[in-house]
Amino acid sequence: MPETTPRGYPTIRRKQYHHPMQTFDALLGEAEVAHGHLCAGQILGVRMAMLGCERLGIEDPKGADRKRLVTYVEIDRCATDAIAVVTGCRLGKRALKFRDWGKMAATFVDLSTGKAIRIAALESSKQRARELYPNIENKNQQQMLAYRELPTTELFSEEWVTVPIHPREMPGYKSARIACARCGEGINYDREVLVGEETLCQACASPETRYYQPLTEK
């Protein structure tokens, strides 16, 4: 007899998806497609993200564990696309956070345990690539070969850290949508600014700090 609810309806069991972590080569192939080309940064990003998941015990970041992981990246370069591919973290899901520090580094946060690990590429890895492949003049080709085979201890530094995440920064956070008193545009996720008695968007509150400047003022 099938299981039923208290009202007699058949119980609907949701399918449990489990996709164990793919191999390095498979993930690198996906990263290459997503990024548009293969480079040393892609290899670093894939290995960095795989290591972060391994340290946190996350086996299925794009399936069963998809709500456990938040990733902070510190550079807007090739490695970030690879990290997004491996972890499944996306900016639009609020699971990928960007800090513009210009560093080849990322911090992986397990929301279920609060554990977090920051992994950074070692500058010495470039010298190790030159030592391993001195006959290859192209630096990218040299690093692509070396970064595939160097042990993680020669590629990365690892540091257990704590990452306080404000509730409004969490994936799935919902807030009221407020209209700016000046431009009328909607503001989400508590990003409004109170200036005197006006509730403004950040662009209207501090026009001099806008990343854009209008050609004609309204």
Label each PLM-derived region with a short phrase.
Residues 167-177, 190-195:
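Short, flexible, mixed-charge glycine/proline-rich loop motifs
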Residues 180-184, 201-204:
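Short cysteine-rich clusters marking metal-coordination/redox-active sites
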Residues 34-52:
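Conserved phosphate/anionic-ligand binding catalytic regions in large, soluble enzymes, centered on
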